[in-house]
């Protein structure tokens, strides 16, 4: 039986594409452009897993589709190669992270090429290449010049096991590090910060201009966390001290019965009484060991200590106790809150625990039983009584401003971006600290500041990076004899990935980040595909850098990525026992269609779960390509279900996709191809062209493949295949199965040219409509016959056909026809007696 020999055909076409630079980016300025971007991978030692090709196949199908539609297509690939994993591996094994990274990249590239992706490899970027990070450093110097990069002594998330501080976004909800799952503690350190807060409003507003999943926009909105409210100043009793709180509900000020400061608040030591000093000091120590996420966990028990001090509520002159509690963060708002326990759940729980007053100021609910958090008219609030929420807020803000004890205020949850890492394997920060106390950026003419090669990459132990040990590199002297020290912190992995999509546009430019005209030609990115796990970190950081570059006149657009698509996760086959615990696949046996634990004999249920080494359910694409072929993997991953759904891997599904490709191969290579069109496939062919064109454009790849299957089924029923339809069909399937597409194109045309730039097939609208139609014939209102007739017959023609039908004739034999009602394209009704 004829079948698709992937082991012969796929390497042949991969070599053809490479030798002929088939996918070199088009530069014809008269053509429309299409920029299809994948989130470039971190080249890990494990290589590609089957989750990577899902997104890559989607952008590849779009790229091949747009090339055929006459677009210049930019479809590049590169490597996000700095970062902790390579450094950890190097420390564990004694290998050089640069060598390890280069080996991993070579392996990733081999795997990617085996899958037939149409990348323009002339544009490959690598974040660890000095010719690349020269421009990462250049962007940093511009941030520094604009005052957007600054040094500060800040409490950081310190991970002892990693020897570095990490950003808030890299701390998991359980208070451990995203990388490695290590404990995170808070400690003050000198750090580089990027002033992303200066762009908070624009980062929020411009989300309206991009075509992104609403869920991702919401995650960014929540992370930026805009609140409109008021600052209120509280004086501390019997002192000259005061503190400010930010509240979104200034209208509830009459219900404020206590205040809470963050343990790190600058005022705490100054106002704490002698009686409370010991308890306060111990509480502060314990709070310093917890991450922000652990401290603000809503489910945890409320803890706190009274400072011994009282504040004066400005609106009614009442004395309220001042506490410290770790759920208030110094880094958020003003680091102090006014507590209104009657109308806030967290404040209510705290007040109940420490027996503090609860005074309702909104009508409704029973505040002895629970906080009332809905809206109601104001009570116990003097000049606000009887007002609704909006009116009361406006009136209270007016009162605060008139009395000089507060003002309207907009705040953001977003914090400045902690940008330094105390590690070796990252971009050196191009700053020199001079002994006269000044700091300067390394001039552009001296960039890149190259990361020095060293065998000793262990953290220094002092909180500085290993670069602090390299005296020759570290110490510099100015022309005037002033000595200086280079910055020893390096940039985080997020730096290189915040602008890589710009370098693809002009990757070999030695004079600038990229040529302005080329940036104008290609920006914004038309489609960006990657995992939803990057919703806040990478996507927010890249948008921030892009806006800075826009302000500098470097890029012509406000936003980098016009459309974003998050592919779903490919889940592995796994098994669950009666307790809900997952069982590794090597501990499972199949008997009579059921699954059992090898050791306990317990029957297990199949439950798809994230692929992991521990469950032994990771599928390596190399194995799939070897057994089934790259085209099978591509078609299967696109046919599994909607691209954004999470779906379980299935060997049966893979085999089904392989069988489909064999049927396609047989159809084109064994069916008689003819120049004569019988018309039998007119409708299904034109429907297929229309459906595949529309569905590829909408990224509904599974339904496009289903339509291709419909065509194959229909074509197999015919003795011959019209050559134009055979060619058109091969063009339609080529983006999904490009090796097969190229091979079958040669079978049909023997052109010696790639199918890649052959104009995409068009469809004939008139052929989409059936030329024949079924009508019913009724006698006395009951259906007696069904006729297939040409469309749009006249009443007379319909009537004649109906009366000539044998079934109808036998029904009306011997009866008088009173009248015949014929409705074109619908029915004929015969009235007899």
From Swiss-Prot:
GO terms for cellular component: cytosol. It catalyses: tRNA(Leu) + L-leucine + ATP = L-leucyl-tRNA(Leu) + AMP + diphosphate. GO terms for biological process: leucyl-tRNA aminoacylation. It comes from the Bacteria. GO terms for molecular function: aminoacyl-tRNA deacylase activity; ATP binding; leucine-tRNA ligase activity. It is an enzyme of class 6 (ligase). The keyword Nucleotide-binding applies. It is found in: Cytoplasm. Its EC number is 6.1.1.4. A motif ('KMSKS' region) lies at residues 610-614. Keywords: Aminoacyl-tRNA synthetase, ATP-binding, Cytoplasm, Ligase, Nucleotide-binding, Protein biosynthesis. A motif ('HIGH' region) lies at residues 41-52. It holds the Pfam family tRNA-synt_1. The keyword Protein biosynthesis applies. CDD domains: Anticodon_Ia_Leu_BEm (cd07958), LeuRS_core (cd00812). ATP binds at residue 613. PANTHER family: LEUCINE--TRNA LIGASE, MITOCHONDRIAL, LEUCYL-TRNA SYNTHETASE. NCBIfam families: leuS_bact. Belongs to the class-I aminoacyl-tRNA synthetase family. This is Leucine--tRNA ligase.
